[in-house]
Amino acid sequence: MAITTLDFNQFRSTSADERQIFCADLCETLSVYGFAKIRNTTLSNELIDEIFKYTRSFFALPNDIKAKAKHPNAPNPHRGWSAIGQERVWKISGFEQNKERTDSYNEFRESFDQGAADDQLFPNRWVDEDDLPGFQAFMEGFYKSCDELHAHLLRAISTGLKLPDTLLPSKHRHNTSELRLLHYPPIPCSALRSNMRIGEHSDFGTLTLLLQDSVGGLQVEDQRNPRSFIPVEPEDGYEVVINIGDCLQRWTNRRLCSANHRVMLPEGKDVDSEEVLDDRYSVAYFGKPDRDVLVDTLPECVEVGERVEYGDHLTALQYNQIKLTRTYG
């Protein structure tokens, strides 16, 4: 079983029928997997090459230089460089199913988080310009490019769900989304027998856009067969993997569900082997609603007589903080 790949050129077609087919296919794929792959997006191949160049360059910096932009040893502000072991995503595994983990394990990765350049609540943290020339300017521009693609996809999902095409975009007027660079250092296959590169989790926000290199290892839980995982292997490095976040699950009353995912051994690797896995790099844009927007089930997504699953009147910021506090707690 493989995650469906869609062509974004269909959404940009001058044919209304073609655009409608794309929107319907997108929502169908997301309803089955919680994930989809999209090629030919508004993120050009050149732009993707450049973001991976900067990602590798940033993580190659000495730790004392990266620490100039250090993420605090606390949930907020969720900005800057997190060293290996600082964030523990496994602690939110099962959160949406009201399940508490009783086990624990190590996660082998480091990350860098940023928000919008004008975010006054949680300002960004950067290394000095001389440490990595052009990094801040490029990252701020790339963030805007991801924001534009995210807005297109929100319109497509709204259309595919037969909602007003402005409904989901209207909840993202003041960008509070986050852009994350990730580095998974080399590690023996055998070390992942009882550990993970990143633990099983679902994403907090609306929709995640993911770019991954050729190493592999990303897996998504099969929504029709819980506890079975499907590999989301890279194709050519230029497709965008998208996945549903918890807020969209809540708004749609589970018509679209956020799927658990993790990073484990790539396909074809042996957990009993002492072979050392290569560095793995990825880039994730976590689309998130405006902080004061409620993430209750939307009335437009409830059929007559259907039970409303989410009515706890949490704002997007409150929900985000509940999960974030666990990962850095």
Curated annotation (Swiss-Prot):
UniProt keyword list: Dioxygenase, Iron, Metal-binding, Oxidoreductase
Molecular-function annotations in GO: dioxygenase activity; metal ion binding
InterPro entries, per database record: DIOX_N, IPNS-like_FE2OG_OXY, IPNS-like_sf, Iron_ascorbate_oxido_reductase, Oxoglu/Fe-dep_dioxygenase_dom
Fe2OG dioxygenase domain segment(s): 175-289
Cofactor stoichiometry and binding remark: Binds 1 Fe(2+) ion per subunit.
Name of one Pfam family that matches: DIOX_N
Sites where the protein binds Fe cation: H201, D203, H261
EC id: 1.14.-.-
One annotated GO biological process: small molecule biosynthetic process
Origin: domain of life: Eukaryota
Record pathway: Antifungal biosynthesis
Positions that bind 2-oxoglutarate: R280
Coiled coil stretches, renumbered: none
Uses: Due to their effectiveness as antifungal agents, echinocandin derivatives can be used for the treatment of human invasive candidiasis.
Cofactors, names only: Fe(2+)
Family label: Belongs to the iron/ascorbate-dependent oxidoreductase family.
Free-text function comment from the UniProt entry: 2-oxoglutarate-dependent dioxygenase; part of the gene cluster that mediates the de novo generation of L-homotyrosine from acetyl-CoA and 4-hydroxyphenyl-pyruvate. L-homotyrosine is a building block of echinocandin B, a fungal lipidated cyclic hexapeptide that acts as an antifungal agent. This is followed by isomerization of 2-(4-hydroxy-benzyl)-malate to 3-(4-hydroxybenzyl)-malate by htyD.
Record-given protein name: 2-oxoglutarate-dependent dioxygenase htyE
Source species taxonomy: Eukaryota, Fungi, Dikarya, Ascomycota, Pezizomycotina
